[in-house]
């Protein structure tokens, strides 16, 4: 029996060839080592101790049970239990359905997830950050901070009811582009059609992935990788020009400053040198008040994109008309190719200097004419952080968290709230609060 690490590494190696078709995946599900590794990865997670519809938890694992599962898979008599569906509250007051699979289904899903991840992870786009190894909401926000400087417009994307509106036939069709194994694809379809339990009544599902299911994240990323690749190609056609044109006024003042710098180098008279230095400082201050390049340059456009699960944020250096067209093109692609709807009420076009929201954070572009008080090596004021990307936690969220962790207390003075820190955090809860806020 092959070592599970070798099995998965072999899959990952073959996946580097985009034309390679995987033909014998189903037989990998007969490898007991994969289940043993899956169990090790799942056993320490508290959520896996929640009872599924079969009333069992993963703590009852045994080799005999694994062999029983494999026997059912061999003759294809294995049938996933309907997922126990519970509802968790959302911020907008609505509820999000969460499916809790039965124990056996959790284990089989984990093995399937390991196989799919080995095949697809290497081909996913860099712009995708949700539910992937070594990626998180923090890497998504870091990529925004590093790559969204100078944004004129944001497009805040939201796909309506994504997890419950995945088309099963399209999902299987996408998988079949790389997987030529009918038994493996039939197993995926069984999970998709497993249905759910709502108030302990069985209902049948025709769309959607089991959101509490272990394979939901990888299936979602495989499905939305089509969107990622469409937008990456769109960006390559949209982007135009090597750099923004220089601001003529900035260029004129810079030319005057440069002339005086050249004179200063050749001037020997100390009094004239001081006068030239004052003029240089004056022109430098004037330059600090102006953008070095034109904000609107018809010959320069840029578009950038970050996705986390079904939420995405697009940065546009261009016109608002460009954004309207981009939004409409994405809406058409989602509807025609993936049978998904872009939420008009949540997909907003936001000015770069206003606040866009993504993953609970506020994203904006700094806009100030103030010059920094710090000075550079030559004693001249440094340029301020104009047009830089700013990511921050909403003030109300910060207030709530600090109070929740007991990291501050609020007093009211002269009708205004005053935030005061408590003593240095020493408890585990306080330390976790400190670490959480530091990460943000």
Stretch-by-stretch model annotation:
Residues 1-432, 438:
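Non-catalytic terminal/accessory segments
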